[in-house]
Each structure stands twice: as structure tokens, then as C-alpha cells.
A protein has these predicted regions:
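The canonical Cys-X-X-Cys-His
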Residues: 106-117
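Extracytoplasmic c-type cytochrome modules immediately beyond a signal peptide or single-pass transmembrane anchor
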Residues: 1-106, 122-137
Length: 137
């Protein structure tokens, strides 16, 4: 999936940075598009000491801490809107936390996203916690 993100310009598109909080970090952006006809939402999570929007704009690679992905997969997990979840390090390797690879039917992701309005596990409908999404076609 990470290789597909790179091939389809998710990684290189101009991003709309905005301020946020846990678990995705104080500065982030969201890119949305399709990979193999599957809706894909990518959140770039930036962090570090005294981070600002300006610092990330100037040197995004320095501040990038994680890339989190939601991908809609037909009949994958109907109980949770068929979303597949993954959390990558900037180098493309998957995060491992508490001896668990952060991908698939990730309970941490699902638990948080169940609080989103709109019944689709995305925060696109929550104007107070969302910013402009960059769309890649």
C-alpha cells in the first residue's frame, strides 16, 4: 500500500497543513484519492519540539513522524464500514506498538474513529476538527 501511495502522488502533492492534537500530532494534513478504485485517505502526522506550521512548510521531511492510512476495501470489515487501517513510519515500514503491527482492523484507529459524525468513521463531517482535504485523482 505504501508503494502505491508513492506511485499515485499521494506523497508529493501540495498539502493543506492544519493544527491538531493527539493521536495524530500537532500539525497534520489529509490527502484523499483512490487506489485501485478503493477510496484512500492519508493523514500526514508531523511533530517535534516547538513545531509550527511554518517549520513543517519549510522542511516537511524533518518533522514527519507518521503516515496513517484508511482504505475502503469491499467486504473487508463490514462491522466497521470496510475500512483497512495502517500506520507507517516515514520510511514506509509499519509501526509496531505493544508487539502489534499497526495495520488491518486496528482497534485503536477504529475506537477513535467511531466517535466521528457521519456514520462513516471519517472526520470529514466534523468541521471543528478537520481542515481542507487535498484530493488526488
Amino acid at each position: 500500500l505504501f508503494i502505491q501511495l508513492k506511485k499515485q502522488s499521494f506523497m508529493d502533492v501540495q498539502q493543506n497543513l492544519y493544527l491538531g492534537g493527539p493521536p495524530h500530532g500537532p500539525v497534520r494534513s489529509v490527502v484523499e484519492g483512490s487506489i485501485n478504485n478503493q477510496k484512500t485517505i492519508v493523514k500526514f502526522n508531523y511533530g517535534g519540539p516547538d513545531i509550527t506550521l511554518e517549520k513543517v512548510t519549510k522542511d516537511p521531511k524533518k518533522w514527519l513522524k507518521a503516515i496513517t492510512v484508511m482504505q475502503k476495501r469491499l467486504n473487508y470489515d463490514q462491522e466497521n464500514q470496510d475500512w483497512f487501517w495502517a500506520k507507517y513510519k516515514p520510511d514506509g515500514t509499519l509501526f509496531v506498538e505493544n508487539n502489534q503491527v499497526r495495520m488491518g482492523k486496528d482497534s485503536g484507529c477504529i475506537g477513535c474513529h467511531q466517535s466521528a459524525s457521519g456514520n462513516d468513521l471519517t472526520f470529514k463531517h466534523n468541521e471543528t476538527v478537520n481542515a481542507n482535504v487535498t484530493v488526488v485523482n
